[in-house]
Amino acid sequence: MSMLFYTLITALLIGIQAAPHTESNVPAGHAIPQAHWIKLQHSLDTVLRRAHSAPAGPIAARVAGQTHNITVDPKLFKKRRLRSPRVLFSTQPPPVAADTQDLDFEAGGASSFNRTHRSKRSSSHPVFHRGEFSVCDSISVWVGDKTTATDIKGKEVMVLGEVNINNSVFKQYFFETKCRDPNPVDSGCRGIDAKHWNSYCTTTHTFVKALTMDGKQAAWRFIRIDTACVCVLSRKTGQRA
């Protein structure tokens, strides 16, 4: 930035010295052509535009080949509005087995960022008491290979797979939940009266903030991910309440 400032000052001084202020103070035969002055002004405008468009905030990042070359300021993850319990930046895959749900990734630690108090996740189903069953069967996993997603405007965007934080490559993970089977039983959802109701299990979605590509810069966007499995009911034709 200092080099750019020095260049601007130098060009400005040259322009001031070369500019003809009046007819009386310019020696005969040494007048600067108007075309040269226009060219100098155009060069200054170009430099100013480049300086104005250069990313300066912590969110902005330049792409230099591969995605892990995108550098992100770790202070960015301390902003509460950018945190999500379903999004994790980590150098290692998060634990997903039931016997590892007591493991935690501390926010700002050596291996992960942007963790919150809701950090314990498991791919296993909730523990039901004897005689209790889930209407739909779901599966939850940490997804670390997401490359594209749909944003809140319905537009397909590119998701950043890796970023550089404190000279370490962190992968972006998403905790997603979806239906294991649309029909856990032959009639549809488990425990539904098939005589009066049609039913099936379907995956629902929500939007979380994630790092995506916006042109040649990294930017936060709300993207859609799978978050739950629910049962959809419809009354069978001819049935009355």
Curated annotation (Swiss-Prot):
Gene that encodes the chain: NGF
Name the InterPro entries on file.
Cystine-knot_cytokine (IPR029034), Nerve_growth_factor-like (IPR020408), Nerve_growth_factor-rel (IPR002072), Nerve_growth_factor_bsu (IPR020425), Nerve_growth_factor_bsu_mml (IPR020437), Nerve_growth_factor_CS (IPR019846)
Cystine links in this protein are 136-201, 179-229, 189-231
Q: What does the subunit section of this Swiss-Prot or TrEMBL entry state?
A: Homodimer. The homodimer interacts with a single NTRK1 chain. The homodimer interacts with a single NGFR chain. The NGF dimer interacts with a single SORCS2 chain (via extracellular domain). The NGF precursor (proNGF) binds to a receptor complex formed by SORT1 and NGFR, which leads to NGF endocytosis. Both mature NGF and the immature NGF precursor (proNGF) interact with SORCS2 and with the heterodimer formed by SORCS2 and NGFR (via extracellular domains). The NGF precursor (proNGF) has much higher affinity for SORCS2 than mature NGF.
- Keyword Cell inner membrane assigned to the entry: answer is no
Where it mainly occurs, coarsely classed, is secreted
**What family classification does the UniProt entry report for this protein?**
Belongs to the NGF-beta family.
Under the heading Pfam families, the entry gives: NGF
What name does this protein carry?
Beta-nerve growth factor
Compartments annotated for it: namely: Secreted; Endosome lumen
Positions that bind a 1-acyl-sn-glycero-3-phospho-L-serine:
209
GO CC, alphabetical: axon; dendrite; endosome lumen; extracellular space; synaptic vesicle
Signal peptide location: 1-18
> Which PANTHER family does UniProt cross-reference here?
BETA-NERVE GROWTH FACTOR, NERVE GROWTH FACTOR NGF -RELATED
Q: Which UniProt keywords apply?
A: Cleavage on pair of basic residues, Disulfide bond, Endosome, Glycoprotein, Growth factor, Lipid-binding, Metalloenzyme inhibitor, Metalloprotease inhibitor, Protease inhibitor, Secreted, Signal
Residues annotated as binding a 1-acyl-sn-glycero-3-phospho-(1D-myo-inositol) are: 173, 209
| Function noted in UniProt | Nerve growth factor is important for the development and maintenance of the sympathetic and sensory nervous systems. Extracellular ligand for the NTRK1 and NGFR receptors, activates cellular signaling cascades to regulate neuronal proliferation, differentiation and survival. The immature NGF precursor (proNGF) functions as a ligand for the heterodimeric receptor formed by SORCS2 and NGFR, and activates cellular signaling cascades that lead to inactivation of RAC1 and/or RAC2, reorganization of the actin cytoskeleton and neuronal growth cone collapse.
Molecular function, one GO term: nerve growth factor receptor binding
Q: What is the lineage of its organism?
A: Eukaryota, Metazoa, Chordata, Craniata, Vertebrata
